[in-house]
Regions:
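Surface-exposed loop/turn positions within long extracellular repeat scaffolds
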Residues: 1-2, 12-28, 42-118, 132-142, ...
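Parallel beta-helix/beta-solenoid
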Residues: 10-11, 31-36, 145-151
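Short, charged low-complexity linear motifs
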Residues: 34, 39-40, 122-123
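Polar, glycosylation-prone regions of secreted, cell-surface, and some intracellular proteins
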Residues: 105, 124-125, 147
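Short, surface-exposed polybasic-and-hydrophobic patches located at secondary-structure transitions
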Residues: 121-130
Length: 225
């Protein structure tokens, strides 16, 4: 049970498993920090059971060697259903944080830290249910990230002039079932599948041009920007 802000430091390779991550503490931050340098060894925190924690799970890979070496594996449909997940890392080539949907699962909110982040899974869906979310990282594998919150999902870097090029598999999908997809950083090169639900909105903010392609399965998609 997490009732106050706590830090879990990984100094080397290995896996830590929490069966039920519980705690009613929306201001609490569980920081999972990769602090080792060098190598491509992986540090993994696996959540194996249903949890009630409604604070922030913050992953940051503060390493100067290796890659994708700080992993949060959600291995239950309700492992982090009420939590906010914040992802970031030193850099894609030197250390990134990874959110893995080991099964179909849900979280409340996704929070932008920086671009060195990856959401991945194989044939699984990560559903985001909260009012708003933001993300500046990549999508990998065959994961589907489905935003159902009805508010705004912001995709892009905090600096509109900084390019966002998701280093991801073309088989990954970002789906907006309800609400608005806002491309905050206009400089986006898109290679994933983008699915917009009926009555959703695609908003392109001021910034450089957007390139790539999108395939809509909706009968009605609004646009603005």
């Amino acid at each position: 049970t997490v009732t106050a802000s706590t830090t879990l430091n990984f100094a080397g390779a290995g896996t830590a498993t929490i069966t039920n991550l519980n705690g009613t503490a929306p201001e609490a931050i569980l920081t999972v920090n990769r602090v080792a340098s060098g190598g491509a060894s992986l540090s993994t925190l696996t959540l194996n059971g249903a949890g009630t924690f409604n604070g922030i799970i913050s992953l940051y890979s503060n390493t100067t060697g290796g890659s994708q070496n700080n992993i949060l594996n959600l291995n239950h449909a309700q492992a982090a259903q009420y939590a906010t997940i914040k992802l970031g890392g030193y850099g894609y080539t030197t250390g990134a944080s990874v959110l893995k949907a080991g099964v179909d699962t849900s979280i409340s909110k996704l929070e932008h830290n920086n671009a060195a982040a990856l959401i991945t899974g194989e044939g699984t869906t990560l559903t985001i249910t909260g009012d708003s979310s933001s993300y500046g990282g990549s999508f990998g594998g065959t994961v589907t990230v489905d935003y159902t919150g009805g508010g705004t999902f912001t995709l892009g870097n905090s600096d509109k002039n900084t390019a966002l090029t998701p280093a991801a598999s073309p088989n990954a999908t970002l789906k907006i079932s309800r609400g608005t997809l806002s491309l905050f950083s206009g400089n986006v090169t898109w290679s994933q599948k983008l699915v917009m639900g009926d009555g959703t909105t695609l908003s392109i903010q001021d910034g450089p041009s957007v390139t790539g392609y999108a395939s809509y399965n909706a009968t009605s998609v609004n646009s603005g920007g």
